[in-house]
A protein has these predicted regions:
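N-terminal auxiliary segments of SAM/dcSAM-dependent transferases
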Residues: 1-17, 30
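Conserved SAM-binding loop and adjacent beta-strand
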Residues: 29-50
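Short loop/edge segments at beta-strand edges and connector loops
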Residues: 30, 109-110, 179, 202
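Residue-level signal for inorganic ion chemistry
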Residues: 44, 130, 161, 219
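Conserved SAM/SAH cofactor-binding pocket of Class I
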Residues: 47-140
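Mobile active-site "lid"/loop adjacent to the S-adenosyl-L-methionine
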Residues: 131-160, 164
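Conserved Class I SAM-dependent methyltransferase catalytic core
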Residues: 155-205, 212
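SAM/dcSAM-binding transferase cores
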Residues: 211-264
Length: 264
């Protein structure tokens, strides 16, 4: 385990870039050719709607996009990010520093399968996660190791991810995830097996008439049964068109200049 609080490293290393992440000078450090943040981070950060007093964990935080967005949008919030890849954990740490969030954003380098030796049990009111969508052996493996590990279950299966969420959540705490729609049944089954009751679900479509590609799910530890399915979110007005009104409102609420910075 490595808990980063300060570093003497230069802000940028070879093969990295410092890019805009929303408004008012928010920046993110990321690999030029490796893993880079996507719209998924924006969607789950907005969906989670944290409360000011929430203790927040970004499980598998990558380069820190979700944690940075939350820290920027909700100034009192304190966020812990857990990431297994050392290079990405370092990027998240340095991203916190370059944005002045080092007092509110802690990055822990470690394996979520060993979360019991890294973080306290039931220590968080809200856990966010954007887990790898593909099982090993399904689909073409990305040749880049950072992207491969982010997209395929190379380091942890869905079952292991959900078990780590269950460990970290306080009683009645919330878990918010974004996942591929084709694996919705797997996700809901695993959540219930860990006594994380699905409470909210929102399908995400590219445009009207397209199948859902992603799903946003909120589950509550030891919550009562009862799932509310929210209206679908359409990212674009039409195939090849501009952002939908709903998506534009999400951008304006969370990070108004992300479209110009290239995330969309």
């Amino acid at each position: 385990m490595t808990a980063y609080t300060q570093t003497t490293d230069s802000m940028l290393r070879e093969g990295e870039s410092l890019d805009a992440l929303g408004s008012e000078g928010l920046r993110i450090i990321q690999s030029i050719r490796g893993f880079r943040h996507s719209m998924d981070a924006l969607l789950v950060a907005h969906f989670a709607a944290p409360r000011p007093a929430d203790r927040v964990l970004d499980l598998g935080c990558g380069n820190g996009a979700i944690a940075l967005l939350l820290a920027h949008r909700h100034p009192p919030l304190r966020v812990v990010g857990l990431e297994i890849q050392p290079a990405l954990a370092s990027q998240a740490l340095r991203g916190a520093q370059v944005n002045g969030f080092q007092d509110r954003l802690e990055i822990v380098e470690g394996d979520l399968r060993r979360i019991g030796s890294l973080l306290p049990p039931a220590g968080f009111d809200l856990v966010l996660c954007n887990p790898p969508y593909r099982e090993v052996g399904r689909g073409r493996l990305n040749p880049d190791p950072e992207r491969r590990q982010a997209k395929h279950e190379m380091s942890a299966t869905l079952q292991e991810v959900i078990a780590a969420i269950r460990y970290a959540l306080a009683p009645k705490g919330r878990a918010c995830l974004i996942y591929h729609a084709s694996r919705l049944a797997d996700l809901l089954t695993r959540l219930r097996a860990e006594r994380l009751e699905p409470k909210l679900l929102r399908p995400v479509h590219s445009f009207l008439g397209a199948d859902a590609e992603l799903i946003l799910v909120e589950a509550r530890r030891e919550g009562r049964p009862g799932l509310r399915v929210l209206p679908p979110l359409f990212v674009y007005q039409a195939r090849g068109g501009g952002l939908s009104q709903a998506m534009d409102e999400i951008y304006r609420d969370l990070a108004p200049t992300l479209v110009r910075s290239g995330i969309a």
